[in-house]
Amino acid sequence: MGIENESPEPDCQKQFQAAVSVIQNLPKNGSYRPSYEEMLRFYSYYKQATMGPCLIPQPGFWDPIGRYKWEAWNSLGQMSREEAMSAYITEMKLVAQKVIDTVPLGEVAEDMFGYFEPLYQVIPDMPRPPETFLRRVTGWKEQALNGDAEAAPEPPCLPKEPAPPSLESQPPRDQDSEVFCDSVEQLEPELVGEEQRGALGGENDTRNSPEPPAEKGRLEGPLLGPQELDSWLVGTVRALQDSMRDVQGRLQSLESMPMPPEQMPPPSARPRPLRLSGPTLIFFLLWPFIVQWLFRQFRTQKR
């Protein structure tokens, strides 16, 4: 009974797998690129839905991207897998609506809408573009099938829905092998595509350096990519280590070098023994007795 309660509903899992398939197959240079916050939300919901609560340790300070991902996943706490799948689907709906509202209504937009078509079959309330765009995409497919691909624009390859993986059979992973995506669980368009597609501006093949999530999705321009940033950090740390070793070596060499004679401290003066003559020494030994004898003589005479 416990397993049945924990397993997600079939419809929810089917919708989740369709949404993951769409995210995986978004074009590398498409007209829409999710923001940094959206990428982190997709990543955290996917990890929660497939692996459960975050149990891996927090990455070190030298892995800022890994820390962002860990914090996003860890923030979900004890959210159930079904709730995470539902949240992933809800986020997918918001992204689809954002595409409809923001992407220019041109041929590129028609391309983009085609990638969401598998979701319309499994998610009834999925936001849809105007029917004219869907008809144009359908017309492209028919022309391609009829052999008129040269006379009409070639439609984009629609993503194929992968076979749903067994959630219980997935072993836990300590840390992602890639900078922003798992080597097997390629889910987010930018968590996968950031290191492959370039910055969010869409014109460079490098990714912005880690910035706060609210600003990351809006930055443009060639900044350090994740691999370049990692290489730079590793090089900096190694340079610091080399500098520390050099300083330690110099200190050890200075400590082992003999000091010049002019800087050597003078030898400590040893106390000289008290040299007294024999009569003087006898006087020092007998003077208390002499004083005592004289004092007694004085008292006797006084009486």
From Swiss-Prot:
Q: Which N-terminal stretch is annotated as signal sequence? A: none
Q: Which UniProt keywords apply?
A: Lipid-binding, Phosphoprotein
**Annotated spans, Disordered:** 148-178, 191-224
State the superkingdom. Answer: Eukaryota
Can the keyword Phosphoprotein be found in this entry's annotation?
A: yes
Query: Per its UniProt record, what CDD domains does this chain match?
Result: ACBP (cd00435)
Question: Pro residues composition bias: which ranges?
Answer: 153-165
Q: What GO terms describe the biological role, i.e. biological process, of this protein?
A: fatty acid metabolic process
Feature: compositional bias, Basic and acidic residues: 204-219
Record carries keyword Phosphoprotein: yes
Enumerate the residues binding an acyl-CoA.
Answer: 23-32, 43-47, 69, 88
Q: Which SUPFAM superfamilies match?
A: Acyl-CoA binding protein
One of the entry's Gene Ontology molecular-function terms is:
fatty-acyl-CoA binding
Q: Which residues carry this modification: Phosphoserine?
A: 166
Give the record's GO CC terms: cytoplasm
User: Gene3D superfamilies recorded for this chain?
Assistant: 1.20.80.10
What is a single Pfam family found in this protein's UniProt entry? ACBP
Residue span(s) of domain ACB: 12-101
By its UniProt entry, which PANTHER family does this protein fall under? Answer: ACYL-COA-BINDING DOMAIN-CONTAINING PROTEIN 4, ACYL-COA-BINDING PROTEIN, ACBP
Described purpose of this protein according to its UniProt entry: Binds medium- and long-chain acyl-CoA esters and may function as an intracellular carrier of acyl-CoA esters.
**What is the recorded name of this protein?**
Acyl-CoA-binding domain-containing protein 4
Q: What is the lineage of its organism?
A: Eukaryota, Metazoa, Chordata, Craniata, Vertebrata
